[in-house]
A protein has these predicted regions:
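Beta-strand-rich binding/interaction modules
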Residues: 106-108, 209-244, 652-692, 699-702, ...
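Extended acidic/polar, glycine-enriched regions
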Residues: 132-136, 215-304
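Terminal connector regions
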Residues: 281-289, 705-745, 812-845
Length: 845
């Protein structure tokens, strides 16, 4: 039985260091009052939000206000709650903390229970005597000031803690170091014997039989102990087994002859079986543990034509190779203890809607909350989980300090022993961008990495362990063939034509981090920037922009391509276009090489605070950028793409049409078509063909060659049809030598007609028609009231004169949380949806 203390009334007080321990002054004997009075707070939660709610700090995400909140990390903080003893049945009672950030002193009814250092591993105290004797319980948690740890720039070899590093300042966030009780606190009642160290996993035999395999330990002694394993699907018992306990351990399995298999997103369904372990002594039930498991077979196989010394980067699920279409994720917020589950759900569902089938949980962040992994199980999103280590720029060599290794082993062993029970977990990595010297990725022989490898082998050997990401041997794509296995980069558009030459000729096996920057929407600017900074500007010339986007200034890039940008809406339009163009080409180029290349993980999906410019695809305020939708298209199960080497070919256009299919069936015939289009819709050149498809993921279907049109700009649309599957993609070119995309900013204004043609709970269907004489580029769906969160099925699409598109728009009431909860206004009426062509003309249409 369990009692969560999150339902209790908590309060919080800030003090100088050591004041809570001394209590009274030496000179006067009077109680020291502390820095703040007692204020209300919530658990789980963090200190910063409690202070904001109480009026002690300004909104830290507006302007440069986070600078005014940096004092928080330098103080001690007392959490306190008093509550009546809950009614719990058992013989042993434990006080369990699932996550405290970071160094905590624990007191119960004025008795010191102990100190705990570390934010990732749960810890507990036996409180049986106190619980049985007292009717009222008073719990005090004293958090010491945050340790002095590295931000993004520093020395990895000097790392001393297992605290999340990103909020000590990273390129995508500010410095706002979290302190708090960030996970639940419980009182757990148990009998004389209890289940411990549980490991539940699944597999599928060559004959197709599903296996649910369970093992663990039993703490305590009892007679005739056994563990009963039950497996159900939709409440129907599918399999059961009795597992005897010997020497305090048990292990066994239940088999399901014809299981419903779990597949990654896009490859099939994600049925989850309910697995229950019940500890019995004779016929007496002593303890129970419940899990949800998808039955699947996970294997790691070499890439096609990979070097002999390469690690396996191809993921095989249920006997089928899965091309990885992934993203990297940062924590959702600096105040990660205050993130509601609905925020996790909105973010991960948006990732799944983008056709994502893998998320890399980045090592500079956190081991995520339980709800994150549950959602990944439900949505079919595989997890590449990193241990909490990251590069630091000046040196990236993993720390071997004895105290650090002790903390690393403690937190990593706990994470490996708990996260192994999620179906979505696929692989582990030692951390982000760890090196053995200045430039070469670290290997298994480094003592830090060897420690982590041993932990994974001991706790969940069914998951592969990579020494780091990128695991090399070359960190970036190298000019020398054959040494670019798992690489990182690039993180920015490389320019025209260099970007296309570089990625079009790459030979890496896996691309676990790459991306491009783009300015966030005008709505973000209005929320976080003072009005004087609502202008297109370089970060070098504006402190507000520099404070929240220093590394990712796209101003020079975008003005080189588009020329002078007259206002912020136009800057947003131009910047997001180049971000989308950059990422789409990289994703498509990688996929065209499948399965020599087995996947792409875009940096990055989200951001933990609202940047004005960043490499994210999905902003802090739940707005999907153009790059989100262009990557979604490139990740489609059936996708046609164009391979090219420049945006402004001279004399003759040369390219090729490719078809990528998750279903690699041989013998099907594809019908292919391409057309070069003027902006008024005239077909300048075109071609059609058919091809019997081989049984491979990506196929070069047609070569294109035609004289460059006498137009300043033109588009090339490619399409493919194979049975019921069809797809089309559009690419934009120029004949200009400088400011090559400037003519796109000056096209005649299109005339759009929009009508809502269907409506159901949470979904509206719209028909958008271009009634004008010129192309309507990158038509964007926007909800104007800011009371609804919308996610169109497709967005930033182009219509030539006379063309129509039917668009399904999902919506739900926008939720506010954290520092933005003050704006919690319930939505009234219906979403105010508009469709706006490129470029944006106003801050808010």
């Amino acid at each position: 039985m369990r009692f969560s203390l999150s339902s209790c009334k908590w309060r919080l007080k800030g003090t100088e260091r050591y004041v809570p321990i001394q209590g009274d002054t030496m000179e006067t004997g009077r109680a020291m009052k502390g820095l703040t009075p007692w204020i209300d707070c919530q658990v789980p939660g963090g200190v910063a939000l409690a202070l904001y709610r109480a009026g002690w700090i300004e909104h830290p995400y507006f302007g440069m206000n986070s600078l005014k909140a940096e004092w928080i990390e330098h103080r001690w903080w007392m959490y306190e709650t008093t509550f009546r003893k809950p009614m719990l049945e058992g013989t042993r009672f434990s006080l369990v903390f699932h996550g405290v950030d970071y160094d905590a002193l624990i007191y119960l009814n004025n008795q010191f229970l102990g100190e705990h250092v570390g934010m990732y591993d749960a810890f507990s105290f036996d409180i049986t005597d106190t619980f049985l004797e007292a009717e009222t319980l008073k719990l005090v948690v004293i958090l010491k000031d945050a340790p002095d740890e590295m931000g993004q720039v520093g020395y990895t070899s000097e790392t001393q803690t297992q605290k999340s590093r990103f909020n000590y300042k990273w390129d995508f966030g500010t410095r706002l170091v979290n302190l708090g009780i960030w996970k639940d606190v419980e009182i757990i009642a148990e009998e004389a014997c209890a289940l411990r160290d549980l490991h539940v996993r699944t597999d599928v035999t060559d004959e197709g039989t599903g296996q649910v395999i369970a093992s663990g330990a039993v703490e305590g002694r009892g007679e005739d102990l056994e563990v009963r394993l039950e497996v159900r699907l939709d409440q129907e018992l599918c399999a059961a087994a009795r597992l005897p306990v010997g020497n305090g351990r048990f292990c066994g399995m239940a088999e399901i002859p014809r299981p419903e298999l779990w597949w990654p997103n896009g490859a099939g369904a994600q049925p989850l079986y309910d697995v229950r372990l019940v500890l019995h002594s004779a016929d007496r039930r002593l303890d129970t543990a419940d899990f949800r498991q998808g039955i699947r077979r996970l294997r790691f196989v070499p890439n096609e034509n990979s070097p002999a010394d390469a690690l396996p980067y191809t993921y095989e699920i249920n006997g089928k190779r899965i091309y990885i279409k992934g993203v990297n994720m940062t924590p959702l917020d600096h105040i990660y203890g205050d993130i509601p589950e609905e925020r996790y759900a909105a973010t991960l569902r948006a990732a799944a809607a983008m056709n994502v089938n893998m998320i890399r949980v980045w090592g500079g962040g956190i081991f995520e909350k339980e709800c994150f992994y549950n959602l990944c199980d439900e949505l079919g999103i595989l997890v590449w989980q990193e241990f909490i280590q990251s590069s630091s720029g000046i040196d990236n060599i993993p720390s071997v300090k004895p105290e650090f290794l002790r903390l690393l082993e403690k937190s990593s062993r706990y994470a490996a022993s708990t996260l192994r029970n999620y179906t979505s977990l696929a692989a582990w990595s030692g951390g982000n961008e760890l090196m053995k010297n200045k430039s070469d990725p670290v290997g298994y022989d480094h003592p830090n990495i060897a420690l982590l490898k041993r932990i994974v082998e001991e706790t969940n050997p069914e998951h592969f362990f990579y020494p780091t990401s990128a695991s090399g041997p070359s960190f970036r794509q190298a000019d020398t063939p054959g040494i670019s296995h798992d690489v990182h980069g690039e993180w920015e558009y490389a320019g025209n034509p260099k970007h296309y030459e570089k990625y079009g000729n790459a030979d890496h096996l896996f691309n676990s981090e790459f991306g491009s920057s783009g300015v966030s929407g005008t709505r973000t600017a209005m929320r976080v920037l003072p009005e004087k900074s609502w202008v297109p500007v370089s970060v070098a010339e504006n402190a507000d922009w520099r404070f929240r986007g220093d590394w990712w200034c796209s101003f020079d890039r975008d003005t080189q391509i588009f020329g002078q940008l007259k206002d912020l809406p136009e800057f947003v339009s131009a910047s997001q276009w180049i971000q989308a163009e950059s990422i789409r080409f990289m994703v498509e180029a990688n996929r065209r090489r499948a399965f020599h290349s087995s996947g792409s993980l875009i940096w990055q999906f989200n951001e933990p605070w609202p940047n004005i410019t960043c490499t994210c695809l999905y902003t802090y305020y739940d707005e999907a950028k153009m790059g989100y939708f262009w990557a979604k298209d490139a990740f489609k199960p059936f996708h046609v793409s164009l391979d090219y080497r420049t945006l402004n070919p001279m004399g003759e256009f040369v390219g090729s049409l490719w078809l990528s299919r998750d279903d690699c069936a041989a013998g099907e015939t594809a019908v292919l078509h391409w057309e070069a289009l003027a902006m008024d819709g005239r077909v300048l050149f075109c071609g059609t063909g058919e091809m019997a498809l081989p049984g491979v993921h990506s196929t070069r279907c047609m070569d294109l060659r035609f004289p460059v049109p006498h137009e300043t700009v033109y588009a090339l649309r490619v399409s493919a049809r194979c049975g019921e599957q069809r797809d089309s993609s559009i690419y934009f070119f120029s004949t200009e030598e400088t400011n090559i995309y400037r003519p796109y900013l000056r096209l005649p204004a299109p005339e759009l007609k929009t009508e809502k043609i269907e409506e159901s709970p949470g979904v509206e269907t719209w028909r958008v028609t271009n009634q004008g004489a010129s192309a309507a580029l990158h038509i964007h769906c926007l909800e104007r009231s800011d009371q609804w969160l919308t996610l169109p099925e497709e967005d930033f699409f182009t219509l030539f004169p006379g063309e129509s598109r039917t668009v399904s728009v999902s919506f739900r009431e926008r939720f506010r949380y954290g520092f933005d909860e003050y704006a919690d206004v319930r939505a009234e009426g219906k979403p105010d949806v508009v469709f706006i062509p490129f470029p944006l003309k106003q801050m808010l249409p």
